[in-house]
Amino acid sequence: YVDKMLTGRKDAFLYPAEYDNVSGYSEPQESKHDFFVIGHTSTSVSLASGLAKGRDLIGGNENIIAVIGDGSLSGGEAFEGLDYMAELGTNMIIIVNDNQMSIAENHGGLYKNLKELRDSNGQCECNFFKAMGLDYIYVNDGNDVQALIEAFSKVKDIQHPIVVHINTLKGKGYAHAEQDKETYHWRTPFNPETGEAKVSYEE
């Protein structure tokens, strides 16, 4: 949604009369900045790998950046994208926002390894991303803007695929959101002091 706000569609989020003028997800008919019609999960890495291939074919030098959350990382499409990027071997920056949160809950061996990486500050011997042939760096405090700037400055214009694994706290700085990640993942209007919803579905 922030992407839509930054690409000329903010009115749909500000004015009720404009609400139906944008879709919930990426839609090329809405904006030149939307390249695909997609859903909301596990798609970014594979789509970015296609953009990277297209860039390489025309001799471009843009940074291709995919952002994916840990909850979406176990999707098959994400695995395919990571696998292909390792083979392509050219510039792509894969940002993994690891906030240990998924509405459906995270299960599987991948999440055990993500925990090992967090617990070891990214240094544990077993590293899923490196095993796939990808470069890797870890940011322990992903809510620290300066730490993010430093990490992104290091990987900008890199000539091979790299994973930037960022450990974040969902809702950082707002106690109600920190304590109730699922409710604040998608929220109706609420009182910022009490955290209580201003509307009820039972009304």
Regions found by a protein language model. Give the residues of each.
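Short, glycine-/Ser/Thr-/acidic-enriched flexible segments
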Residues: Y1-V2, E30-K32, G71-L73, N99-M101, ...
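Mobile "lid/hinge" segments at catalytic clefts and subdomain interfaces of large enzymes
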Residues: S74, G81, A86-S120, C126-F128
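Conserved thiamine diphosphate
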Residues: Y25-P28, K53-N63, G108-A151, V199
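Terminal amphipathic helices with adjacent charged low-complexity linkers/tails
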Residues: V96, I103, N143-K198
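Structural beta-sheet core signal
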Residues: G50, A66-V67, I94-V96, I166
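Cofactor-binding active-site loop characterized by glycine-rich and histidine/acidic residues
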Residues: Y1-L88, E203
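Short acidic, glycine/serine/threonine-rich loops at helix termini
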Residues: V2-G8, L73-L82, A104-G109, K115, ...
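Residue-level preference for the first positions of well-ordered beta-strands
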Residues: N63-I65, N91-I93, P161-V163
